[in-house]
Design a protein with these regions (language model features):
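Eukaryotic intrinsically disordered, low-complexity regions
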Residues: 114-151, 176
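A conserved beta-strand-loop-helix scaffold within acyl/acetyltransferase catalytic domains
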Residues: 138-149, 153-156, 160-181
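Conserved beta-strand-loop-alpha-helix junction that forms the acyl-donor binding cleft
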Residues: 84-89, 211-221, 237-245
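Short, high-confidence coil segments that cap the C-terminus of an alpha-helix
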Residues: 52, 206-208
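Conserved N-terminal entry element of GNAT/NAT acetyltransferase domains
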Residues: 1-13, 96-121
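Conserved acetyl-CoA-binding loop-helix of GNAT-fold acetyltransferases
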Residues: 71-78, 180, 186-203, 221-226
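N-terminal charged segments
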Residues: 1-89, 127-129
Length: 246
């Protein structure tokens, strides 16, 4: 288990320096840049770097951490932490293991044949499709970060898959709440939807587009990979005992 006493670390409350550290160790398309940036700098608290690892702390309505590398500094303030490529077992410092999710991303471009996406504005219909086909979706109508809902249809004209294009407070563009109607699964509609959102994000000026998906959702991961998205990181969420998101 990592222990901040085992290795010396540097820390900073300077966001620009912190993102520089992240880029040096993790590359341009990385988790930290999706969650914190100059656009939501007021949420950034502190970052920590060791010889081989990086971690940071931010305010998400609770004290939220991210940790990357084999020996990251653990901030004792963390109530929840996402650990990349976790090998730490059931406990991570004072936190306990909860669940796993993966992040994917792509440099946007307009994809020939997928230049447009149909906008969906019927919020009652959107909620119905989510409730019936993806009830654990993180984004529902009314979320202020939504830029638009989009859909694709089958040959009969029926809606087959929906999703939301979202811009987080960090400025990151993200696809959220992708739901394929159960009878239409396995036919490539989620891949088509993703390609159309990649084009749309490019048209809106986004350089990159990301998404999060449950580590167990193999079918969805394959759909995103077929659309050209690459894995950024596999995360394990750790929670402070008794923690409940506000």
């Amino acid at each position: 288990m990592p222990n901040s006493l085992q290795k010396s670390f540097k820390q900073t409350s300077d966001l620009t320096l912190a993102l520089g550290w992240a880029q040096e160790r993790l590359g341009d398309l990385s988790g930290p840049g999706m969650f914190v940036s100059e656009a939501n700098a007021e949420r950034f608290i502190e970052a920590f770097v060791t010889d081989d690892s990086f971690s940071f702390t931010m305010d998400s309505g609770f004290i939220y951490g991210h940790a990357y590398g084999p020996n990251p500094h653990i901030d004792p303030r963390w109530e929840k932490c996402a650990v990349a490529y976790n090998n730490f077992g059931p406990k991570f410092g004072h936190l306990e293991i909860a669940n796993q999710f993966d992040t994917y991303g792509i440099s946007t471009k307009v994809i020939p044949g997928f230049e447009t996406i149909e906008e969906l504005t019927d919020e009652v219909l959107i909620k119905k499709i989510l409730d019936e086909n993806a009830p654990t979706s993180s984004t529902y109508p009314g979320n202020p970060e939504i830029l638009q809902w989009g859909c694709v249809r089958n040959e009969s004209g029926d809606i087959s898959a929906i999703g939301a294009l979202v811009r987080w407070s960090s400025g990151a563009y993200v696809i959220s709440s992708v739901a394929t109607v159960e009878s239409q699964r396995g036919k490539g509609f989620a891949t088509e939807l993703t390609k159309r959102f990649i084009s749309r994000a490019n048209q809106l000026g986004a350089e990159t587009l990301g998404l999060g998906v449950s580590h167990k959702n193999i079918a969805a991961i394959k759909a995103y990979q077929k659309a050209g998205m690459s894995e950024i990181a596999q995360f394990t969420n750790y929670l402070k005992p008794g923690f409940q998101s506000k």
